[in-house]
């Protein structure tokens, strides 16, 4: 299985080129690049007011207002500090780098900008991890978080004194995707037996899990719910960053591997079809050719 990168590599590579050219003393060039990411997220890298030495990176998330309710603005201020500027029109967050004042740790700055999407997502997880570590449960100053991270797909997060439960709803666009999704989730459950530190993973098809009872969660033949039960060892200060890195990408991870599995199956089917055609071609009998003569002595060939 392949782990998807949590950063946006195109954003990082674009900014790296800008910094390296500036360090080398090359003339600054204008930039206007739009980059797509998972979950309908868009990045926009551009200059401010035509100043080629000022490079602004903006991010647009359709669900950012929901993240703001869980401390997204505060987390970004903590992570980006003076890099934050007023958001560009049509975007939720913007950061600015000055190519005339390059910091010594510019590579770390590039890395942090590439993690903008991850850090926006992190706010809701950190909030509920803190609730759990403080021994607070639902009804004790907090309620379940509901993040509509994609059209018709939702993430739910709630804390109990002994665990944090994260539920992803997802839509399978094809009947085959449901089958492959079930197989994939079964493999995850089997893999947990080999690792006693892995979180509990549950999958429900058509019906939402009990955690979402009476919430109006969607029901349907193409609806699936993936539930993670995170225990204190997953939400502790020293491990929570890795937990967030892995869990916020899970929906994309699942569908990526479903598509890879379908592509592999199709390639195997095409390979088998090619082999069968070769066998049939070898088994085809050669046509019989008979040479005969007429009464006048002319020769003709008859193919049977």
Curated annotation (Swiss-Prot):
Transmembrane segments: none annotated. One of its GO terms (cellular component) is Arp2/3 protein complex. Its main location: cytoplasm. It is found in: Cytoplasm, Cytoskeleton. GO terms for biological process: actin filament polymerization; Arp2/3 complex-mediated actin nucleation. Pfam families: P34-Arc. The keyword Cytoplasm applies. GO terms for molecular function: actin filament binding; structural constituent of cytoskeleton. Keywords: Actin-binding, Cytoplasm, Cytoskeleton. InterPro entries: ARPC2, ARPC2/4. PANTHER family: ACTIN-RELATED PROTEIN 2_3 COMPLEX SUBUNIT 2, ARP2/3 COMPLEX 34 KDA SUBUNIT. Component of the Arp2/3 complex. Functions as actin-binding component of the Arp2/3 complex which is involved in regulation of actin polymerization and together with an activating nucleation-promoting factor (NPF) mediates the formation of branched actin networks. Seems to contact the mother actin filament. Belongs to the ARPC2 family. This is Probable actin-related protein 2/3 complex subunit 2.
């Amino acid at each position: 299985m392949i782990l998807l990168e949590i950063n946006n590599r195109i954003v990082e590579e674009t900014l790296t080129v800008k910094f390296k050219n500036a360090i080398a003393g090359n003339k600054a060039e204008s930039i206007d690049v739009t980059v797509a990411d998972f979950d309908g997220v868009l990045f926009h890298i551009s200059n401010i007011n035509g100043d080629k030495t000022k490079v602004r990176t903006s991010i647009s998330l359709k669900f950012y207002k929901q993240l703001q309710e869980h401390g997204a603005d505060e987390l970004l201020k903590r992570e980006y500090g003076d890099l934050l500027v007023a958001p560009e029109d049509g975007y939720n967050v913007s950061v600015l780098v000055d190519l005339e004042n390059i910091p010594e740790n510019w590579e770390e700055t590039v890395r942090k900008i590439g993690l903008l999407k991850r850090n926006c997502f992190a706010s809701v997880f950190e909030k509920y991890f803190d609730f759990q570590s403080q021994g607070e449960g639902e009804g004790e100053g907090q309620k379940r978080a509901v993040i509509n991270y994609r059209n018709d797909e939702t993430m739910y997060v709630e804390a109990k004194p002994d665990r944090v439960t994260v539920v992803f709803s997802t839509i399978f666009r094809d009947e085959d995707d449901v089958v492959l999704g079930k197989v994939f989730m079964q493999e995850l459950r089997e893999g947990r037996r080999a690792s006693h530190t892995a979180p509990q993973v549950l999958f429900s098809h058509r019906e939402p899990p009990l955690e979402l009872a009476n919430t109006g969660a969607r029901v349907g033949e193409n609806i699936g719910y993936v539930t993670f039960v995170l225990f204190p060892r997953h939400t502790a200060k020293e491990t929570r960053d890795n937990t967030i890195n892995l869990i916020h990408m899970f929906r994309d991870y699942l569908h990526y591997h479903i598509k890879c599995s379908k592509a592999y199956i199709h390639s195997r089917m095409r390979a088998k079809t090619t082999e069968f055609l070769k066998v049939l071609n070898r088994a085809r009998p050669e046509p019989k050719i008979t040479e005969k003569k007429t009464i006048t002595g002319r020769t003709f060939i008859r193919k049977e």
